[in-house]
Regions:
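Extended, charge-biased low-complexity segments
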Residues: 1-49, 108-160
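Amphipathic protein-protein interaction modules
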Residues: 48-105, 153-217
């Protein structure tokens, strides 16, 4: 586990960014929102103790991030006034912050790709079943949503010279990945859902792939 001075922010484009792209691209070249949410860019930033400081860190680096996102979709020569506005940046992207980092490279600086371990709805159902009969915990879990579970989901920093290796890696190591993610939710491994195959693992967790992990503070 990486307990360092870094955390990771993943940028999720919004419909505002999609509308911006639509204003810049031929109609047939405009991506849909699902495409924008596939392989989102992940950025390594300095870790802070408060959300206010984290927002300040993002604001300090937003122009670099905004520029990169625009170039990803419009090409390196694209220029637009929107990239100078932090308010526009906030409208164009939602942030996912991750500080629970499993490092599989010598240093985080050496990492250039990222996997996010996202809980699925079946895991939330399991968590609710585990607190049945415990009134206070039942009330808490009834208010819980899948988005609560996916906040600060576990991420793995690992490089894949050939992207085809990713699926093989996940299939080979699904069990330790499962154990790492589950240990954050319950230390009673005997009570965990039974996962004895990649198929059963995939019922409880989805893997998001980020082929670009960009370091902003080095």
């Amino acid at each position: 586990m990486h307990q360092g001075s870094s955390e990771i922010v993943v940028l999720k484009p919004t419909t505002v960014f999609l509308a911006f792209l639509a204003s810049q691209l031929p109609l047939n070249d405009v991506p849909d929102l699902a495409s924008l949410h596939t392989d989102c860019t992940a950025y390594v930033i300095n870790k802070h103790d408060s959300i206010e400081e984290t927002v300040e860190e993002i604001e300090k680096n937003f122009s670099t991030m905004f520029r990169h996102e625009i170039c990803r979709w419009l090409g390196n020569n694209a220029r637009n006034d929107i990239e100078t506005s932090f308010l526009d940046f906030l409208c164009c992207f939602k942030f996912e912050l991750h500080s629970h980092i499993v490092l599989m490279e010598p240093t985080i600086e050496a990492g250039h790709q990222l996997l996010t371990i996202k809980p699925r709805a079946l895991l939330l159902d399991w968590m609710r079943s585990e607190v049945e009969g415990e009134y206070e915990l039942e009330n808490v879990m009834e208010q819980a949503t899948l988005s609560h579970l996916t906040e600060n989901a576990t991420v793995i920093v690992k490089n894949f010279p050939d992207l085809k290796e990713i699926k093989t890696f996940i299939k080979q190591y699904y069990r330790p990945i499962f154990e790492t993610a589950m240990s954050r939710m319950s230390n009673q491994s005997s009570a965990w859902p039974e996962v004895n195959s990649f198929k059963s693992f995939s019922q409880y967790f989805a893997i998001e792939i980020h082929t670009q992990l960009i370091h902003l503070h080095y």
